[in-house]
Amino acid sequence: DFGLFQQKAKRATDQSFRVEQLSKEFFLYLGEFIKAQREGQPPSNYSWQLRIMAATRTLPGWDDVEMMWAQVGETMALLLKSLDEIYKALGELAADGHDSVEDSMGNLSNLMRRMGEAEAASSGLMHKPSNELIYWVEVNPRGERLSLNAAPLRVGPLVQKHLWNEKAAVIMASATLT
């Protein structure tokens, strides 16, 4: 039913605007937390980084950042659920012979995957850390951009699995490889 589909699309649109607004607020809270951690440090031409560890999560102000993220994460979960409902509705249309929706389904699937990955990485940084990852917040030299980062602690098994075991030949070039 087209009316039901429109309702789902409107709900997802409203939720996406809510995620956007809450994300902006989250980064404002995070920016204030970072500013407090940088207190007294001179400006630099280099990016500034704060490693997020258990001790970081006990610092004053972190609770506010974490509560703000909880709102973002909850709303993002609702949005992902709405997008999944739309994806299923598009699947029903495709099954009924409307081939024109297949591109939209592919785009929506990719969007949902990327949003899910971003939510999982951000939740790990905020309050569900993995022992296999390292987390940090980075501020660019001019201080106008914050980025959340996560990276594996042990890359050897990943390189072995995805490169050495999968490829017949591998050429790696880097200024840091010796």
Question: Where is each model-derived feature located?
Answer:
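ASCE RecA-like P-loop NTPase motor cores
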Residues: D1-T178
